[in-house]
Amino acid sequence: LNLLMNNRWAAFAVGILVLAVACGGSSPTPVPEASDAKFQPPAEKPTATSIVPEGSLIVPKIVPDVDRSIYSVPLEDILFDTFGTTRARFVPLSEISDELQTDLRDAIIPVDFPAYGGADALPWLDDDDLVLGYEAGGEAFAYPINILNFHEMVNDTIGGVPLLVTYCPLCFSGVVFSREVDGQTLTFGNTSALYQSDLVMYDHQTGSYWFQVGGEAVVGTLTGARLEPLPSATMPWGEWRALYPDTLLITGADGGLETLFAGAVYGNGIGSGYQDRVNNGQFAFPVDEDKLDGRLATGEIVLTVETGGAVTAFPLGEIGDGAVNAEVGGEAIVVFTTAGGRSVGAFFRTVEDQTLSFDYQGDGLFTDRETGSAWDFAGRAVKGPLAGGLLERVSTRRSFWFAVAISFPDVEIHSP
């Protein structure tokens, strides 16, 4: 696993280095050659290595080849990260060989057999480290972003729901999806490709390619299908643990790797300077300028609420600490945010046929104007006439603005 992670982070670091050099002058970031068909890869290509035995994290599989004759985005815009196996920094889907395409599959290993432990299971996990949180059947599950930086997706079934936890480090996008599409349960892997600097996944059942932020199939037989986003929340680990003391924490994978993620290497995160570079339009992988939406800075972190067939983006930097009462798709919702937008969640705000309006009162509590009841960040009424009540979470995505705008060109932006 060390070699695998070094490959991914080395590739990421190269992109950052190029961006840093570009910041020193006015000329645009140089774009490397797209491909080099004559170059022979090293005799020993990168493997999933000595620390993690091959196949121990992922489902053994025979995956159909993606049908490249069916697509909704240009094949040349889907770029494979070669991790140094060719002279080219990336190779487009329109030019990649079948052999290299297969070799790069799951070079970033997803987790198909997750193991969980208690809140103290990861010694490196600090209270300020972000986690992607999910609730089901009275249980809470936490997925540290530092782990998702390395593995990017987790296939699991929780509370009888087949789900996919996803994260793309290049656009800070954390989304939980249902894995069910038209009655079929899909299992997902990593193509090692990116579209508009966002993770491209594939499904084992059809080989189709999926754009992560939108959850949309863009190449293959399922092109046009979308995954259903599920409610989740992002917040610092200390806050999640305080809300859910009995939370389960992903710690590794079944089959002897249950404590794999306790290793100190997983404590490494991405430097804060990356967001500034994205705001300056300097991406680690190419992004089509025609697809950028200037209504917000490209690196603005937004929470996107999707319900009732509508999508609305809430700029977290503008909101700060507060409660935003809004309507999306005809549904009354509220966005709770604290810690300068690092803690964020969204809920339907109708309780027992009464629509509530919320204000932030401090100390992680929110008060509804109608009854004066106090609610915590988990949507639980802890004081007042509605004590014991619970708000229902709404499906969300947390991401850089550029990825949301590309996924949903007609997205609305909430303005106070």
Task: Describe each region flagged by the PLM.
Residues 1-2, 44:
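Intrinsically disordered, low-complexity Ser/Thr- and Pro-rich stretches
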Residues 2-13:
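Bacterial N-terminal signal peptides that target proteins for export
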Residues 19-22:
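C-terminal motif of bacterial Sec signal peptides marking the signal peptidase cleavage site
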Residues 24-27:
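Bacterial signal peptide processing site
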Residues 30-416:
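Mid-to-C-terminal functional-domain signal that highlights helix-capping/loop sites
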